Amino acid sequence: MRVGVLGIQGAISEHVEIMRKALGDAGQEGEVVIVKKPEHLEGLNGLIIPGGESTTISSMLKRTGLFEEVRKKAIAGMGIMGTCAGAIMLAKKVFGGNVETLALMDIAVNRNAYGRQVDSFEADVEITGFEKKFRAIF
C-alpha cells in the first residue's frame, strides 16, 4: 500500500507519522510519501489532505497543478481522506467562506474563522478492528 500526504500546508508531519503508525499497528506493509507535485500522485492507493487553512490549500493546489490531478485520481477510484481543512477541501458545499473546493464528497461544511483553535485536544480512542487505543488529535 502506498499512501500520500498532501505536503502543501498544514499538519503534514503529524499525518505522515500517524499513518506510518497506523500501517504498522495494522500489520500492513506500506509506504507513506509527501505529495507536492502532480507526478507524486502516481502509484498511490490513497491521499490524505491534512488540516491547515483551506483557502491556502486551495490556492496552492491550483498553483502546483495538483487541483485537477487530485480530482481526476479521486474520480478514477483513488481513496482520499481529509481532516479539518482537508475535509473542507473535499466538500461540495461550504458555508462561511469563499474557497474553491475539490467537491468530491456530497457534504456541506461550516468553515470556521481565522484564529486559534482553543478547543483542540488529543485523546486515545477505541477503533473497531484495532487491538490498542489509537492516539487521535481533534
Give names to the regions the model predicted.
Residues 5, 34, 82, 103-106, ...:
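Structural signal for conserved beta-strand scaffold positions within catalytic alpha/beta enzyme cores
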Residues 1-63, 68-75, 133:
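N-terminal beta1-alpha1 cap of cysteine-dependent amidohydrolase-like domains
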